[in-house]
Regions:
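Short, cysteine/histidine-rich loop/knuckle motifs that typically chelate Zn2+
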Residues: 124-129
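Short, non-ligating residues that shape and space the ligands of small metal-coordination modules
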Residues: 134-135
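A structured, charge-rich N-terminal accessory region that forms the first stable segment of a protein
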Residues: 1-119
Length: 136
């Protein structure tokens, strides 16, 4: 399986989901399936904002493997938020599921039963976005 020629550097505090979307924009990929095929080698992948999985496949395709799994999961997903009060065993299971699995990490961590649900769209602070654009 071929690797990616280009992948944008992850910005401080940036979610992996954002970097994946940025890769699509910068690469001219307009189809979500085309983007997943480019990133994972398979079009049937589903990107999640907070707890992505199959990261071993993605890491294996990146042009620079500086983004080690622990750094990627710990620094660019919401893994820390969802696992802050979980046992070490459950945190390790979630990490492994995100790294190599295709199962639902949300289900494993009990996040699929939240009554409030998840927002229908991503939210952001316009002032913060301007500051980030200036900084990066």
């Amino acid at each position: 399986m071929r690797g990616l020629v280009f992948f944008p550097p992850l910005l401080p505090g940036e979610l992996l989901y954002s970097a994946l979307a940025r890769h699509g924009v910068l690469s001219g990929l307009t189809s979500p399936k085309g983007l997943m095929k480019d990133l994972y080698g398979r079009a049937n992948m589903i990107a999640t904002v907070d707890l992505p999985n199959n990261l071993s496949t993605l890491l294996g395709r990146l042009p620079s493997r500086r983004s080690a799994a622990r750094h990627l999961i710990g620094g660019h997903t919401l893994y820390g938020y969802y696992t802050a009060f979980q046992s070490l065993e459950l945190r390790q299971m979630a990490f492994e599921a995100m790294f190599g699995g295709e199962g639902s990490v949300h289900f494993l961590l009990g996040a699929s039963v939240f009554r409030t649900g998840r927002p229908a769209y991503l939210q952001f602070c316009p002032d913060c976005a301007i500051q980030q654009e200036h900084d990066h």
